[in-house]
Amino acid sequence: MNNSNSTVMIFDENNIWKILFRIAPPVMLAQLIHAMYNIVDSYFVGRYSGDGLTALSVIFPVQLIVTALAVGTGVGVNTLMSRDYARGRVQRANRTAGTGAALAVISWVIFAVLSSLFMHPYVATSAESPQAVEYAVTYGRIVCIGSLGVFLESIWSKVHQAGGNMRLPMLAQISGALTNLLLDPILIFGLGPIPALGVAGAGYATVAGQVVAALITSSALRRPPKLRALSRYARQIYKLGYPSIFMQMLYTVYIMALNMILAGFSDDAVTVLGLYYKLQSFFFIPLNGLQTCIVPILSYNFACLAYDRCKRILYDSCGISLVFMLVGVVSFECIPDRLIGLFSQEPAVLAIGVPAFRVIGLSFIPAVLSLMPPVFFQAIGAAGPSLLLSVVRQICCLIPLSWLFSKTS
């Protein structure tokens, strides 16, 4: 790949802050735009129907499964390519990129089939209102069957980022989000000869935006290797990417479990949880952006045996993230009613959401210290300890405690 030399120049820069401030802003902007997909959908759907807003909250964990598979595979591709660039193996990096695209298509086919079969049984466990169930099944099937764009864009963006190109993924995210923003009100409420599709329209707008983003990043498409070699590359990709997939899957299982617990109280409680996680994705952009950026940098420097630089990159990234997360803490503590009011003015939603947001906002600062270190282990191919910690924290502690408090409080 022609940009391998530029990758070496960027990642060899002595000033770590200069590296981060060069490559992080485009990635953070891309993630900001990505976060806008769900926020924009929730904004317009919330004005269409309260049950529609509940439906989006129920389907949010399903969308996280897509993200876990797509981004986790992309992380494996990104890490493997970064190591190959560090060792001057450009052709091998190209074969890795080709394997990633093939894995994206295979993952999409499997996920689309399974989600279509099990969508209704899942939704029935997380929503009470028949209208909310109907909306959730409709929206969920549209975004899952149409998720090929997510898989391809995630892989191709990581290919570009491994080569030091952070701008094209940013452009793709911006274009996709603008497409979604333009189509959402038109397809939800109708315009001229275009009929109002309601919640289904939000699903179609989301899929259209994702397809546009995938097309823009498609210059990263490479020919996959032959079948035997493809399976070998796939094992290497998933060996590096499975920690990311597994940790995001744990997060998804955690949210699904909370939805099921809260559904026993009211659909409004499920709605509040969905709104929180969508707003959280906005305030966590600096943290998530730095996590994305430091993976190839850490992988490159670790391959070059620059261990002190790896530690310094991790420490500096934690410091930057802590400063940015203070904005989220202040917002959730001081203006929770305004944050929720962007999507819903229903008294029941506000009554549940305002105190909940103030409690949860206190967790933003410690979140940095728990979420950043696992990235280091992932980048160097030693993610076992972080995986164990994630299982204990989310599955063994948080879910049982949530269930217990729901019965006693």
Residue ranges and their predicted role:
Residues 1-27, 81-148, 194-242, 298-363, ...:
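Short alpha-helical transmembrane segments in multi-pass integral membrane proteins
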Residues 11-43, 47-48, 64-76, 80, ...:
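N-terminal transmembrane alpha-helices
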Residues 22-41, 142, 153, 176, ...:
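Transmembrane helical elements of multi-pass membrane transporters/channels
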Residues 32, 36-54, 123-130, 186-197, ...:
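Helix-terminus/linker motif at the lipid-water interface of multi-pass membrane proteins
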Residues 50-61, 136, 140, 203, ...:
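Small-residue hotspots at the loop-to-helix junctions and early N-terminal turns
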Residues 53-113, 150-164, 168-169, 272-330, ...:
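Small-residue-rich hydrophobic transmembrane alpha-helices
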Residues 60-63, 107, 175-180, 205-213, ...:
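Transmembrane alpha-helical core residues of multi-pass small-molecule transporters
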Residues 145-149, 153, 157-161, 167-214:
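Helix-loop-helix hairpin linking two adjacent transmembrane segments in secondary transporters
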